[in-house]
């Protein structure tokens, strides 16, 4: 391999890693995408090291190494950029793009930004939906009373999912799937709670539904699963329990210690921790089953 070509491959690989890291991709995804792109372009191997503010990448070809480093500046979560970069890497792997085309495509990428007023409106509407999901009255929520329980449960889970998907700059075509996954996940948890399943297990199974559907959609639309799943799990975040724990701590500090306040604080904190744990494991399970390269044991 010619030295100049390897240098060009190194530059495009580090640019790929930098774009992914800047816009909120996981470190594992960043490293894997850079390695896959380099191998697809003909180098023997790619080594990538990430720090909080830099990317260091080395390509190896014909016993010749080239190392480069780039400073990382966080540009906020933008799943549109992550998805577009992944599609470019996949296109190179399928021999649809050569080095020059891949470089040009990466240079042409622009972060998706939704209209700020639309984001503000959807976040406000999302907060109203959270109020309803937390047993707020109809005046606060400002919605119709004629919907069936499960239908408006799905609706009020879908609204905040879309609102936060806009915050995360999810690709426009993925917005409807974020809403659908949020609706299906939350209504699954509601049904499981209705049959007296503990909220931790209900949340875990509901998050698994979102996770598996997210993996399916990622294969179908060549996007990262988190483009569909991260916003969808937002309605199940235990904000009320966390708020109660915080308020109890403030009251203990202000009014002094009491058994009732301490019990409420510990109970709310434990509920928050276990529900968050259920969400994390439920969302990680599909990845462990479908993407892991080595056996767990």
UniProtKB/Swiss-Prot annotation:
GO terms for biological process: succinate transport. Keywords: Cell inner membrane, Cell membrane, Membrane, Transmembrane, Transmembrane helix. One of its GO terms (cellular component) is plasma membrane. The keyword rRNA-binding does not apply. It is a multi-pass membrane protein. It is found in: Cell inner membrane. Pfam families: ThrE, ThrE_2. GO terms for molecular function: transmembrane transporter activity. InterPro entries: ThrE-like_N, ThrE_2, ThrE_Dicarb/AminoAcid_Exp. Its main location: membrane. It comes from the Bacteria. The chain crosses the membrane at residues 114-136, 150-170, 197-217, 227-247, 269-289. Belongs to the ThrE exporter (TC 2.A.79) family. This is Uncharacterized protein HI_0108.
